[in-house]
């Protein structure tokens, strides 16, 4: 009976034990359980700490819980006008908010945030700790959100090493792979959604320039009231791309 099934599902979701189910589901689906698999470079991302890490995870879990509890449209997974923040995470997102408790926050229409792929936890697990990976993020979008996973790469294709010295951008590094015939067809699908997220750094902060440990200009940013000297402002970020029609 459809009504009986619906009542039983609602009963289970209303139980506090369902929080563990949601946590486990998100760990498997989005890979949130891998958030500690990489450690952000302390020189490039000195602001990353456990308080920020905890807030990142809480945002995604509370966001998904809200979708379930309010029976909201799955469109919110791609683009939403709200999220959950506390002071620490809001600061990371360039927003102002008081208090350490996570609360529901409305997002402005011109905000770069909205949906799962702009949440710091997801952006963190789709990076390697030092640099972003348009390939990894593009794969994530195609596989986890669109259900159209690309083919595995050829076995003889080497890995892409990040350049933190500010001499080459990720786009320039990836160009070599796109020029290989056996790679080109997949990269035409993978790269555009991956590059669309290139304005978000490995810990989910919004950026217009890459951070560099070598070349670049001194940053005007501050960390806890002191000037940041650990990194410089490197090349400009290019988040452009075009998907196949």
Indicate where each model-derived feature is located.
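Aromatic- and Gly/Pro-enriched helix-to-coil junctions and flexible linker segments
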Residues: 1-3, 7, 11-15, 28, ...
């Amino acid at each position: 009976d459809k009504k009986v099934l619906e009542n039983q599902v609602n009963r289970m979701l209303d139980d506090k034990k369902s929080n563990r189910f949601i946590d486990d589901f998100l760990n498997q689906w989005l890979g949130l359980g891998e958030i500690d698999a990489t450690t952000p470079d302390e020189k490039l991302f000195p602001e990353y700490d456990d308080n920020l890490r905890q807030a990142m995870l809480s945002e995604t879990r509370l966001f998904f819980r809200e979708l379930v509890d309010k029976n909201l449209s799955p469109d919110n997974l791609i683009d939403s006008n709200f999220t959950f923040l506390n002071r620490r995470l809001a600061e990371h997102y360039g927003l102002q908010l008081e208090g350490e408790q996570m609360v529901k926050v409305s997002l402005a229409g011109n905000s770069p945030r909205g949906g799962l792929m702009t949440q710091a936890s997801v952006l963190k697990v789709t990076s390697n700790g030092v640099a972003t990976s348009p390939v990894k993020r593009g794969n994530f979008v195609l596989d986890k959100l669109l259900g159209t996973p690309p083919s595995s790469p050829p076995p003889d294709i080497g890995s892409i090493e990040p350049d933190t010295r500010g001499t080459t951008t990720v786009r320039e590094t990836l160009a070599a792979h796109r020029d290989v015939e056996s790679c080109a067809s997949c990269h035409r699908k993978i790269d555009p959604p991956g590059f669309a997220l290139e304005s978000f750094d490995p810990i989910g902060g919004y950026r217009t320039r890459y951070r560099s440990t070598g070349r670049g200009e001194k940053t005007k940013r501050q960390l806890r009231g002191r000037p940041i000297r650990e990194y410089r402002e490197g090349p400009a970020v290019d988040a452009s791309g075009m998907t196949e029609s």
